[in-house]
Amino acid sequence: MIINKSGGTASSQGKTYRVTIPNSWIEQLGIDEENREVELCFDGANIIVRKKQTLQEYQNTHKQNKLLQLKFYHGDTLCTTILADETDKSVLIENHTDNPLYTAFGVQDDPDWQDYCDFLEERCIPKSRAGLHEYLTAIGVAEYSPIEIIRKTQGRMAEDQAWLEVTEL
């Protein structure tokens, strides 16, 4: 572990930490100068470095689970593809625009399951809305379930041009 004092605008107590990883490990991950995007995960006890998965790789490794694909559009433009694994409660996204105003999760590139659930709730009628039961009956949904409401309404809201397409994989 290499420990250095931080520079720039960091506090006088600020430090940076670097770890050197053996070449053989990097080669096994398939990381090279052109494909070097990785994810760092910390579970409270372990730091995990892994190659960032593509949507196809994620779909292949989660194919035994209940997997949904949501495509988030602004008008006719596809802005974000979301893969949501309802079995293990994980999410992977790919943004198709650089404008965070039009992406499903704004500037956040690595949403977790709670972020995904919050996003779904934002795209449908609030659970506390008066007349909720009548609304659900009118659209043919038995109980409050954001994903089921979105399947019926495409997550369309009066104040924007965003909408969702949901597919079971």
Regions found by a protein language model. Name each.
Residues 1-169:
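Phosphate/dinucleotide-binding and metal-coordinating scaffold of catalytic cores
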